[in-house]
Regions:
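Aromatic pocket-lining residues of Rossmann-like dinucleotide-binding sites
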Residues: 24
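N-terminal Rossmann-fold NAD(P) dinucleotide-binding loop
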Residues: 17
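N-terminal Rossmann-like dinucleotide/flavin-binding domain of flavoprotein oxidoreductases
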Residues: 44-103
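Glycine-rich FAD pyrophosphate-binding loop
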Residues: 27-42
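Conserved small/polar residues in nucleotide/adenosyl-binding loops
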Residues: 104-111
Length: 111
């Protein structure tokens, strides 16, 4: 089966993953984000976050991750569930396998 070609593939749905998705979506890169085993990442197990900019009164980890997810969706991120099982970064184009489906990045002339 031929690999699905994507402009931007993000693996993981913690704060970094969702932030990358928001920026990529705003840059019209049509990001595909795989949420993994625990959507929202480890931060969903944190009860109070008091040291993150923009939340002067603090926020729960679950609420913060819900906010980030909604914002990523709002800008057009394609959110999917799956687990990365292999990554071949030894040559270009890279090949990432998620639950038996392979992905490769689009090259600039293919976009």
């Amino acid at each position: 089966m031929e690999a699905e070609k994507v402009k931007c593939l993000i693996i993981g749905s913690g704060p970094a993953g969702y932030t990358a998705a928001i920026y990529a979506a705003r840059a019209n890169l049509s990001p595909v984000l795989y949420e993994g085993l625990q959507p929202g990442g480890q931060l969903t197990t944190t009860t109070d976050i008091e040291n993150f900019p923009g939340y002067p009164e603090g926020i729960s980890g679950t609420q913060m991750m819900d906010d980030l997810r909604r914002q990523a969706e709002r800008f057009g991120t394609d959110l999917r569930y799956g687990v990365a099982t292999a990554a071949d970064l030894s040559r270009s184009p890279y090949k990432i396998t998620i639950d038996a489906v392979s992905y490769t990045p689009l090259r600039a002339h293919e976009t």
